[in-house]
């Protein structure tokens, strides 16, 4: 933080590495760490799959098996349809979002300073603290909601659902369409902003605690236990937000798939 005011330090840490300043710019750091998190997930599961044994499993294999069985049980309980796509999707979402969230536990100055050695002056390492990333994932869930609705009811059923519900009269079709559209759009929007809001707030608190280290000795000493306490608590937030995103995805897809039965 040398040579920077507090506001400059905070502002610097909230700047993305991007391709330009227009609305359509690409956040390179978000893409990089999202892909890195996906590679870590695939590498771990591929390694476990290759070394899987029917004998006494290792610690990592045991942990992965427990995780897979746990998520498969959640999907089985909540999604009453073919699970060959939804169960792997739920596992991928939970692990991917968890890894992206967990990057927030790395000290806030470590990765930006490391990037600075390569001439990169701005870097935000937590993809889920970027609304463009969480909204992108939520739009994919939105597309799957529409897909499973059409799959269970057909395109005609989809049209009827958004024109003749909740008021089954032709004169109220515009009202029905507005009400159902708002309900539908609220799902991906709330999904995106819930994850983004929690992770952005967590990142900002870590930055504010880091600011304390540049103050006098008494405040800097206070920052150490605060940092440790928040990091421990943040482990819960990291895990919980990954679970909530995964769980709501399964629930939304279940509602879309089973609407034909209601």
Swiss-Prot record:
Cellular compartments annotated: Cell inner membrane
Family annotation (PROSITE patterns): ATPASE_A
One function term, GO molecular function aspect: proton-transporting ATP synthase activity, rotational mechanism
Chain segments annotated as transmembrane: 25-45, 86-106, 130-150, 204-226, 240-260
Biological-process GO terms, alphabetical: proton motive force-driven plasma membrane ATP synthesis
Organism: Mannheimia succiniciproducens (strain KCTC 0769BP / MBEL55E)
Taxonomy, superkingdom: Bacteria
Name used for this protein in its record: ATP synthase subunit a
Entry similarity comment: Belongs to the ATPase A chain family.
Record function comment: Key component of the proton channel; it plays a direct role in the translocation of protons across the membrane.
One Pfam assignment: ATP-synt_A
Keywords: ATP synthesis, Cell inner membrane, Cell membrane, CF(0), Hydrogen ion transport, Ion transport, Membrane, Transmembrane, Transmembrane helix, Transport
